[in-house]
Amino acid sequence: MDTDINLKNLPYRRCVGVVVFNHEGKVWVGRRLTKYAHADTEMSHRWQLPQGGIDEGEEPLDAACRELYEETGIRSIKLIKEARDWFYYDFPQKLVGCTLKNKYRGQIQKWFAFQFTGKLSEIATNPPPDDNKAEFDQWKWVDLEALPSIVISFKKHVYRKVVSEFRGSFRCL
């Protein structure tokens, strides 16, 4: 059977994505560990926002808070906005079989924006809290508008939508 036909029959994995604004309106990004980055990903394009799967029976907002904590240690947040729509991306053909046990053609994501209200000492990525697996080797705050230029190519269109969705959402506390 043709791989392209198989791909089209695979479902999208339901996920959440998280935008965290600091008090200056900058956005938290983490640089993917080499073992999670794809072989041809340039170092400058290994950055991404926290994201992850929605567990069976879990509400997207709860999943967003859980994933944010598991990946970053961040719990001190205030919800700013939920994206109106779900955004999706397909995995590139070369990654099929290497990503998520070949069960999905890509991911469909509900995005949330939060205000970080804690102290920087709360952020823990390597290692993250509660024996979670580290996914990031570095983190930094960047301008929201810069996101599409620092992520892997097959996610750029989603990040453009995220920027458009949450542009102007940050308000100083």
Curated annotation (Swiss-Prot):
Keyword Hydrolase: yes
Record lineage: Bacteria, Pseudomonadati, Pseudomonadota, Alphaproteobacteria, Hyphomicrobiales
EC number: 3.6.1.-
Homology family: Belongs to the Nudix hydrolase family. RppH subfamily.
Function: Accelerates the degradation of transcripts by removing pyrophosphate from the 5'-end of triphosphorylated RNA, leading to a more labile monophosphorylated state that can stimulate subsequent ribonuclease cleavage.
Keywords, comma-separated and alphabetical: Hydrolase
Biological processes, Gene Ontology terms: nucleoside phosphate metabolic process; ribose phosphate metabolic process
UniProt-recorded name of the protein: RNA pyrophosphohydrolase
Record GO terms (molecular function): bis(5'-adenosyl)-pentaphosphatase activity; guanosine-3',5'-bis(diphosphate) 3'-diphosphatase activity
Position of sequence motif Nudix box: 52-73
Residues in Nudix hydrolase domain copies: 11-164
SUPFAM superfamilies the record matches: Nudix
Cofactor: a divalent metal cation
Top-level taxon of origin: Bacteria
Hydrolase found in the keyword field: yes
Family annotation (InterPro entries): Nudix_hydrolase (IPR020476), NUDIX_hydrolase-like_dom_sf (IPR015797), NUDIX_hydrolase_CS (IPR020084), NUDIX_hydrolase_dom (IPR000086), RppH (IPR022927)
